[in-house]
């Protein structure tokens, strides 16, 4: 992007104000990958609320400012100069990250770095031992190759996941129109939209995309769709008048990339390319760097623990080796062997596969995860900042209430009309239905007779679409009904009159009268009426009926609904005979003295599943905050209807109204709910915003700009929350990128929102987030179990080296054997724990505290290493010494035997019975010991995976066979063990030997001990919550 500080950028707010530099004052949270100070400063500057006044200037002032003409446009020569100065009217993409850098990042995560270090150590050890002719030389080489292979394979998988998502800026390019109609030197012609410059005079019509930020000079019946930019679900009227000090609120500015729905417009280009609102959002979205995910932080924390312990143990035994007489090189080999033995080689694959399985499970429930780590992040979420339009609501206007015969009725918009609350034979209803059907320009797209009415495609704006569908549901065949009342003339809706009028002939050929019907802003329609239709009778519109109208109007408006008024007038055949030439310019027909028929209110209704989803979030301790660009009254009404503002909760304004006191006399802390609009947010300093978020549990932000959404997310993060942001519009993309996890809508979502997000809801259903939260929490619990299972065997893999060094026994366990444990036999049970059901209703627990509830905590490490791991070590050594003794090598003889055992030249070493062993025989016996120790670990690990099914409940309560994948994994583990032991050729390939059956039985008592020991631990945890036992032994 160019130098943004040289451009005149703007947002909802005007002027610096007390909070104008809010974003710049706020301290930045540390981001993944960091960034230069200048880049951060530039991003902060972009987030400031900046000022323009083009919408407030007169036409003459605009002509002077941009050296243009409001009738002839720019001169061709000046346009060429401006294009050369400002560049094309296009979004300039940021410098992309090279693909090799993306791939390198996948190879350089926390666990990956640890494994690279381990592989390097193995290669160094290989080089040292090769120079000494050591028999374990090849083992270290194989181990290094295996470690590198694991890192590369998992890195390729991660890179593939990232490769599937596209660059954010590319999605904004999809919004750029290709052609624009421009007037230069008085000539009208079409050019590529990227050739537009400031000061160009352009024309648009319904169906065109706005080619730049336009100051409107003339408009007729123009409406634009700003929903993807501001979040407003209603089509917005555009006219030449300045109606608001804010450029996003005024009617005389149309924004780059929004859609012109109907009417015609002529205007001046005031901003192009990166200087437009959409350009600024693109800069914000691409400038915001991703936060580290909680799972990435947890893995870093875990790597720190593992690396620290590995170095501690390695250094300790390096010193011991030096003290007992080993050479420096030999002691260094021991140090490296211990460090490598401490690295859980299979953990990286386990975490990747577990997250992938959960992502696949979520995909089957309409949640597509772009970033694997986002799976767990959603489970950690404590705050959801949700957009309203299209996320909480259906993004389609629907008739909600009707007022006629002095009663408010709830509209039934279902196909069977079984819930209709009024008499459809009422004469007043028939008249109202006739008016709303005839005074309507919307039409169904042809060929949809078999499609349910709510799902039919309609050509027309949102309000008229809602009225047409309601008419179709209540009348049936609304289009045919219109045909029976042919339209004679029409005045389209415009912002000056605020009404739409049409005149029709009657369906009865014997009745020569005309019917005039009108709809529009209720107060404007009512002022043109002199009578009101009540129970089919026209009554004078006296003060009593005006008060009844006002009461109903305020009641419907207070629900956040859009209200329209309807009226009619029969034109007598004497003054307006058949064939009369109605003239809309001369208005040769009456437009007052009409008969008021009723009111119809519409709203973009909440999705049916949202209230239950919000309630589940509340139960799970997750706070749902609405952040929308829509009107505060509408936002509050929707928030109340879906449960974001709970029943009985009051805002400061509600309390003031109830107590009949001014708002400033109410203690704000007494209000549980709070609705803040964009202008108020602009005047708040950072501490006030944080205090508001802390004080009011139920928050709604309305009329917010994309910059403000970003600031709201940062403020929540500053309070220590893990923030999820949902949205579907272009305006949501910066906040989606900034959030700990961004969730975009798959159907209604813009490409920009989808590319900025970490997760996409294919069904656009907010309720799917609850499923994601549940799966995220479950995978955290199950990852904890998988890691505990994976770490336990580190001790029985490590202790053979410790005994080998300190007691000088023949090596009980080889590197290749460890590799088979880590990457072959144990990987399947470890992954199978990802399929374990939740122990309790995890959606009734509060979100985990990232600082306190760690993936790997002290109780988990202590229990896995020093309790279960110690038992497994005893099992391994028991089996090892049993196998050695049965072959003639009693335990006491084994002590101090290492040097002689490994002597290549000694071919007559005697055992406890006096039998002589050659080096080759001793080597095969060592392979037998490797296999015996391997089998001991595997038998104990079967017990270990069974106890890891639960952390608190008894395994009997959870059930042994509910997780069928785990049962299959155990069977597979045993089969692999048998294959490695008894397959011919294994001694020469992987150092495995056939072993006696009784050596399989030696570790069984230890497996039973592990199971019983853990059941006692769980019983204590359940019986003594909060006790020392619970705190130290519950992980």
UniProtKB/Swiss-Prot annotation:
Q: Any transmembrane segments, and where?
A: 99-119, 143-163, 300-319, 332-349, 784-803, 814-834, 855-877, 930-949, 964-982, 998-1018
Q: What does this protein do?
A: The catalytic subunit of the gastric H(+)/K(+) ATPase pump which transports H(+) ions in exchange for K(+) ions across the apical membrane of parietal cells. Uses ATP as an energy source to pump H(+) ions to the gastric lumen while transporting K(+) ion from the lumen into the cell. Remarkably generates a million-fold proton gradient across the gastric parietal cell membrane, acidifying the gastric juice down to pH 1.
Q: Which residues carry this modification: Phosphotyrosine?
A: 7, 10
The primary gene name is ATP4A
Question: Superkingdom of the source?
Answer: Eukaryota
Description of how the protein assembles with itself and partners: The gastric H(+)/K(+) ATPase pump is composed of the catalytic alpha subunit ATP4A and the regulatory beta subunit ATP4B. Interacts (via the P-domain) with ATP4B (via N-terminus); this interaction stabilizes the lumenal-open E2 conformation state and prevents the reverse reaction of the transport cycle.
Lumenal side, ranges: 120-142, 320-331, 804-813, 878-929, 983-997
Q: Where in the cell is it found?
A: Apical cell membrane
Membrane side Cytoplasmic: residue ranges: 1-98, 164-299, 350-783, 835-854, 950-963, 1019-1035
Q: List the disulfide bonds.
A: none
Q: Where does K(+) bind?
A: 340-341, 343, 345, 797, 822
UniProt KW keywords: ATP-binding, Cell membrane, Hydrogen ion transport, Ion transport, Magnesium, Membrane, Metal-binding, Nucleotide-binding, Phosphoprotein, Potassium, Potassium transport, Translocase, Transmembrane, Transmembrane helix, Transport
Q: Report the source organism.
A: Homo sapiens (Human)
Family the entry assigns: Belongs to the cation transport ATPase (P-type) (TC 3.A.3) family. Type IIC subfamily.
Organism lineage reads as: Eukaryota, Metazoa, Chordata, Craniata, Vertebrata
Q: What is this protein called?
A: Potassium-transporting ATPase alpha chain 1
Task: Enumerate the Gene3D superfamilies for this protein.
Answer: Calcium-transporting ATPase, cytoplasmic domain N (3.40.1110.10), Calcium-transporting ATPase, cytoplasmic transduction domain A (2.70.150.10), Calcium-transporting ATPase, transmembrane domain (1.20.1110.10), HAD superfamily/HAD-like (3.40.50.1000)
* MF-aspect GO terms: ATP binding; ATP hydrolysis activity; magnesium ion binding; P-type potassium:proton transporter activity; P-type sodium:potassium-exchanging transporter activity; potassium ion binding
Residues binding Mg(2+): 387, 389, 728, 732
